[in-house]
Every structure is written in structure tokens, then in C-alpha cells.
Amino acid sequence: LLVVTYGTVLFGIERFVHARIKALYRTVHDLRRGSTGTPGEQMKGDVLGQVHAEVRAWARERNTEIAELEAREQFRREFIGNLAHELKTPIFNIQGYILTLLEGGLEDERVNRDFLDRASNGVDRLIKLVEDLDLITKLESGVIGLHEEDIDLHDLVRTSMEGVDLAANERGIRLVNAVPAATLVRGDRARLEQVLTNLFNNAIVYGREGGTCTVSTYPLGEQQVVEVTDDGIGMAKEHLPRVFERFYRVGKSRSRNEGGSGLGLAIVKHIMEAHHQTITVKSTEGAGSIFSITLQRV
């Protein structure tokens, strides 16, 4: 009788534990599916093994989500820090010039003009930074629509080069338009001109004095690939995955001295994404970089 009673109790405990494990499994399974009210799948066979596998998979998913959240938080901190630095530099410069003028510089016409010009340049840099941030925000939210049309790519490259010709001449960089005439693509002309201008400015800032920046193109399926090639300082491989991030700079001192906002390549990326096209970069440290964009071929 004692043995029968013991067996009955043991069987009851086993069924109780088994039922609770099944309930736990259904709960974990439903949570993975994003459901809180729908019963999960019924289990058969190795209950503990299935629970173990399900919990491990659920833990891996949570760890992945945590890693993504940590990466976003790191990006947010870097963005705020970089933005504060980009705003602080011109503001402090402007403040210094104005204080110098107030402390006696106004009496010297030469110093007066020089410091006012420098303060004006600082204001222009702030305006450019705010405008670029506003543009990126609008591109991300889809507020800015594209006015697509058929574009002569050779002419687009030519007009874009004319806008940066003075800056290129100051560093002795030769701009070469190797795009054949009558190469037609489709897109928003104003935005694509901004893309090329930003890529040219990047090539000028990081290019080699007396070097060359060349634009070439070739068809690839229904797309037209456009390559902007420079023979400048190039980039190490570890920089390439981040080069299109806001405020990310490879050569911080040179680009800041040139007065860039640090948003040029980020804007390029967003404009290309708005066109449902791509931009990629290949670079060799000490040998130069190649930025490639795709456009819809006509």
C-alpha cells in the first residue's frame, strides 16, 4: 500500500511539473512571436529539450536587441558630442573676434576689417551646419520630394565642377570630366548636383596638392555607375564602414580647418537613398579613394 501511495504521489507531482513546464514553454513561445493572448504550439516528445532550446533562442534574440540598443545609444552619444563640438568651435571663434574688437580693435581699421571678416566666416559656417542638419532631417523624414527628370550626365558633372573650380585651383587639383556626351540618367538634378559637389569637395579636402579628381561612368544593367576618383591620402579599411555617418571625419584637423560641416557624405548617402540608389566607397591609404554612385539609366 505504501508503495502504491508513493507511486501515485510521484506520478501526480510529475504531471504537475510537466504541466507547469508546458505552460512555461507556451508563454516563452508566445512572447517570441509577439503575442500575449494566443495559445502557443502544443509540445510533444522531449518537453525539457524543447523548453531549453526555446529559452536559448529567446535569450539570443534579447541579447541581439540589447546589442543593437547599445550601439544606437553609443551613436547618439557620439552624435551629440560631435554636434556640440561643431557648434562650439565657430561660436567661440566669433566670440573671441568680437571681444577683441570691443577691447580696442575697433580703433584699428585693419584689425577691424580682418576680425569682422573672420567673424562673418564663423557665422557662415554655423549657417551651413544648421542648413545641412535641416536637410538631413527632411531627407530622413521624406519631407523633401524629388523632381525627377532626364539629365545629361556630362552636363551635370560639368556644372558641378564649375561650382568647386576655385577651391580646386587653390590646391592645384585638376578636375577631369571623363563622362561621354549625351549620357542620360534620371533623377532630381538639383539634388544630384549637390551629391557631386559634396563628393568633389571631399576629394579637394583630402586630395593631394597638384593631384587629380576624375569622374567616369559605365553602364551596369539598368543602372549607370558614376565614379569619383581622387589620388589623395585615402583611408584605412577600418574607416570605410563609418565614412557616411554624420560628423565622422577621417582627417579631423584638415577637414575642420577647411570649414566643412562634417555632414557632406551623410547628405550624399541620404540623397542617393531617396533616389533608391546606392553609394559605395573603395579606398587605399596613401593612394586615394573611389566613390561610386548608381543612377537610373535612360
Annotate each PLM feature.
Residues 141-146, 184-187:
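Conserved micro-motifs of the catalytic ATP-binding
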Residues 209, 276-277:
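Conserved glycine-rich
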Residues 153, 234-245:
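Short helix N-cap motif at coil->helix boundaries in the Bergerat
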Residues 210-222:
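Short beta-strand/loop element within the Bergerat-fold HATPase_c
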Residues 203-204:
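Short helix-loop "hinge" at the ATP-lid/N-box region of the Bergerat-fold HATPase_c
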Residues 147-152, 169, 174-183:
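Conserved catalytic submotifs in the C-terminal HATPase_c
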Residues 121-126:
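Short alpha-helical segment of the dimerization/phosphotransfer core of two-component systems
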